[in-house]
């Protein structure tokens, strides 16, 4: 009885142990997290890439020799997309923006390429015999300012087509373009040379070259995007909370100018002051106006151009004669300018905590810096801006300290024209601009200022600002301050409870990918948000790339008649190759990971809590993909490597599994092509067994010899059991009971093979029989134990059901009894109260009777 009790207790412990183990396994599996690959997530990283251009050059001018060469650009999108990114904050830095450097290099390349086929003026570096051109002093219109227009009538010898012969020609040069030889500045000097002959290589601009700036849109190739800050008061650096994504920038006019920014974009609300460090006087200050100020420039006199041959196939274009009407000038409305400058002064005073803002002219330097230099109708103007920057603003009194006139009389800027221009691209380069025939008029809008602050340790309340410029990067920076280029990373990894269970052997579809622009609209959504539709996003990448490549090819085909591509053509080729490379790289990674054609791909790589110990709910409900990518960025390479190793191992397992497919059909087992393979395997097995038998026989003989047994030969008989009628041993020695009689060890090679095969078959039969009996016993025990466990669980369920039912009934009975008792007590209390009230008159009467008695 005691044994049976112990057996029953052990059975109960066994059952409870199995149940506990199952619960633990379930709980442990529920907490396991696995790496899952997502394709099409809205994640980006800062990057530097080759941008290409888009422009509507043909709609502006059909001039084939425009210096900006925008005819090689892709046509602009008639319906550009701008997708707002909600709940996204991105850092911008206009002073560390590669787009500015790239635009600067592009514009330099365009200038150099446009001037490359033009005439070099090295043969013109000769002695010029010049005299003053007979001119009169002229009065500038609307300003009553008289100034002498200085030009020199020069004669010089040039080489004709026949190189050993020269001829003398005459031409008019501006006084600013020539200098006396040997620095003789006397008024009586007659020997001159071109100003840049001893320092720069001078190239004459081609006569048909146009300098009219045409808006250029910079576009990102497929796989990249341009982020745009839409904060109306963004100062160019720091975080921006209102971010959108665009494929191309707005149209940027590459206007080369100093001091004043022309034909740019305006601020939407108030004037914006931008500087890398406002307290550092060495840093340029870029002012973006909120209202433009018109500037109208005129060259009233009419030049007559002449063509002079200076060699075989080369010609010099100079001024032959001109009609004198007046000096070149520019007009600006005084009221508009003073109003604008007043707002700028208030803004600067508030930023620097100064009460008085002083504007003064440039302190000196090259003409390009001390004046407002720009191109007007093909001529290069150098205008004196001392009339614009010569005022003082008292912020405390909100008035001009040197009260200016309030009339609307325009401010007239005196302008000089130069034909030999120092190239802004670098030192040692100069350009000769041929004179333009006829009268020149141009109108522009002042949209910004370039200022510098005077230095010193003055702690007073005054601050002085002067016009600056000269570095064209600041001109491009004033337009590109709100853009940055990012590289889209459509591949993302995150932990989930899903694990790749089986190896699929069907064909996989070709993947598409994630749209390089459209899907970024979901960047502010959480990782588990329903708005993140990966399927829609993934279908757009390849079609977007194809469309973009078609546009690039059309632009490149338009240039095939040229002997060499412009800088835009080269960039289009680079963008085309880069887009395909980006797509193929992502597809290669997906293929290596076994995720081709899948937007959500589970893996067998367990998630390591050291990568991120956040809970699954916290990751998918509270974090965006950008935040998640920043958190695991240091471990992305490790995760990718583990996924690759896991997929490699899975492919090996798959290969081994596929190798067993030829045994899937029973008929294949009897295929005649397999017979030779069967025979080979059979021979190998038999040979191995025979060899093993021989080895063990030799080892047995060696062992017997060591024990003192010396067989005469391989025919030595082994002891065999005696019969019951034979005596055990001889008389002298007696016999050992149980000794076997001798049998032959071997009897030829055939007998050896037969014995081995027979023993092998018997051994296999006995072992298989034992194995089958053991397996049957195990199955029987497992079935019995399983059935008992099921019956126990069923009885346990019935027991707890009865207990719950009884408990519920008892609870209801108890509640009913308590309610009944409470109700009876309440009724009794109410009844006694009513009875007491009813007996009040009786008690009063009884009291009165006692008093009367």
From Swiss-Prot:
Residues 509-529 are annotated as: Fusion peptide. A motif (Di-leucine internalization motif) lies at residues 852-853. Residues 130-153 are annotated as: V1. Disulfide bonds join 53-73, 118-206, 125-197, 130-154, 219-248, 229-240, 297-330, 376-442, 383-415, 595-601. Residues 457-468, 460-468 are annotated as: V5. Residues 32-681 are extracellular. SUPFAM superfamilies: gp120 core, Virus ectodomain. Keywords: AIDS, Apoptosis, Clathrin-mediated endocytosis of virus by host, Cleavage on pair of basic residues, Coiled coil, Disulfide bond, Fusion of virus membrane with host endosomal membrane, Fusion of virus membrane with host membrane, Glycoprotein, Host cell membrane, Host endosome, Host membrane, Host-virus interaction, Lipoprotein, Membrane, Palmitate, Signal, Transmembrane, Transmembrane helix, Viral attachment to host cell, Viral envelope protein, Viral immunoevasion, Viral penetration into host cytoplasm, Virion, Virus endocytosis by host, Virus entry into host cell. The record marks 508-509 as: Cleavage. It comes from the Viruses. Residues 571-589 are annotated as: Immunosuppression. Residues 362-372 are annotated as: CD4-binding loop. The chain crosses the membrane at residues 682-702. One of its GO terms (molecular function) is structural molecule activity. Residues 383-415 are annotated as: V4. GO terms for biological process: clathrin-dependent endocytosis of virus by host cell; fusion of virus membrane with host endosome membrane; fusion of virus membrane with host plasma membrane; positive regulation of plasma membrane raft polarization; positive regulation of receptor clustering; viral protein processing; virion attachment to host cell. The keyword Coiled coil applies. Residues 703-853 are cytoplasmic. A motif (YXXL motif) lies at residues 709-712. This is Envelope glycoprotein gp160.
